[in-house]
Amino acid sequence: MSAVIIDGKAVAARVRADVARDVAEFRAATGRQPGLATVLVGDDPASAVYIGGKRRSCVEAGMADLHQHLPADTPQDEIAALLDSLAADPAVSGILLQLPVPEGLDGAALVGRIPPEKDVDGLTTASVGLLARGLPGLRPCTPSGIIELLDAYDVELSGAPTVVVGRSELVGRPVAQLLVGRNATVTICHSRTRDLAAVCRGADVLVVAAGKQAIIGADAVKPGATVIDVGMHRTEQGLRGDVDFDAVREVAGRLTPVPGGVGPMTIAMLLRNTLLAARAAAEVGSLV
């Protein structure tokens, strides 16, 4: 029997609808409009497309689009000054610096200018520390979107043998920490893992964020397992993931497609984070 296909578009649409409703209620109750400041340095076509999608989604959710576009030759200190200004601006609920930045700029240092309470990407050292300690904070969008998908399909995480393939700072490590926070029993695999397929076959839940096309085949999947494919690779046949979809769908119990699985969740969770940041700021403001 073929796997149940996890519909990321449908789950993301529900999250977006919930956020839009909650934004309207927030604005009515507080008189404030959540604002997302996206910062794009340079004219990289792919980055421009990504930012455009985030900006449109922001407006559709009823938030203020506070976009900032800087030339590629903008000095580091000028970008830092802009980020500091946005951090101090009460109209800005969340700040997102589109990565990568142009060559010659220190992207990590620039991201570090964003205060954790406005770090809607969940990428700053402070945000990473809050996640590692299990303390409240804004979580990285793609990892939190993965958890949202698992919850939407009633995947039991507590006690579940779970394997994460990939240890990147953007997805692998944070999703492993989120899964541990849900009491899953987590193993992290990477390029030096011995007999990767054998390790993966022990998983009830398998999250693949390796950045290598079709690294996971049917031989690496336990029958009935839930498989989340985070990879995205452009090929002559279209977008493909880190999982051999056609082979794995005949073994897995649930499986995300590429495209249409994890991808749509990222912007949906960005919108949710921006609303959460706006709510937290309003609560702090009410106490001042």
UniProtKB/Swiss-Prot annotation:
Instruction: Please indicate if the UniProt record lists NADP as a keyword.
Output: yes
Q: Where does NADP(+) bind?
A: G166, R167, S168, S191
* Gene3D superfamilies according to UniProt: Leucine Dehydrogenase, chain A, domain 1 (3.40.50.10860), NAD(P)-binding Rossmann-like Domain (3.40.50.720)
Among SUPFAM superfamilies, the record links this protein to: Aminoacid dehydrogenase-like, N-terminal domain, NAD(P)-binding Rossmann-fold domains
What InterPro entries has UniProt attached to this entry? Aminoacid_DH-like_N_sf (IPR046346), NAD(P)-bd_dom_sf (IPR036291), THF_DH/CycHdrlase (IPR000672), THF_DH/CycHdrlase_cat_dom (IPR020630), THF_DH/CycHdrlase_CS (IPR020867), THF_DH/CycHdrlase_NAD-bd_dom (IPR020631)
Q: Which PROSITE patterns match?
A: THF_DHG_CYH_2 (PS00767)
Q: Which GO terms describe its cellular component?
A: cytosol
| Catalyses which reaction(s) | (6R)-5,10-methylene-5,6,7,8-tetrahydrofolate + NADP(+) = (6R)-5,10-methenyltetrahydrofolate + NADPH; (6R)-5,10-methenyltetrahydrofolate + H2O = (6R)-10-formyltetrahydrofolate + H(+)
Which example biological process does GO assign this protein?
tetrahydrofolate interconversion
Q: Which domain of life is it from?
A: Bacteria
Q: Which UniProt keywords apply?
A: Amino-acid biosynthesis, Histidine biosynthesis, Hydrolase, Methionine biosynthesis, Multifunctional enzyme, NADP, One-carbon metabolism, Oxidoreductase, Purine biosynthesis
According to UniProt, this protein's pathway is: One-carbon metabolism; tetrahydrofolate interconversion
Which GO molecular-function terms appear in the entry?
methenyltetrahydrofolate cyclohydrolase activity; methylenetetrahydrofolate dehydrogenase (NADP+) activity
What's the Enzyme Commission number for this chain?
Answer: 1.5.1.5, 3.5.4.9
NCBIfam families, A to Z: PRK14186.1
Looking up HAMAP family in the UniProt record yields: THF_DHG_CYH
Q: Which family does it belong to?
A: Belongs to the tetrahydrofolate dehydrogenase/cyclohydrolase family.
| Function in brief | Catalyzes the oxidation of 5,10-methylenetetrahydrofolate to 5,10-methenyltetrahydrofolate and then the hydrolysis of 5,10-methenyltetrahydrofolate to 10-formyltetrahydrofolate.
Quaternary structure and interacting proteins, as annotated:
Homodimer.
Name it. Bifunctional protein FolD 2
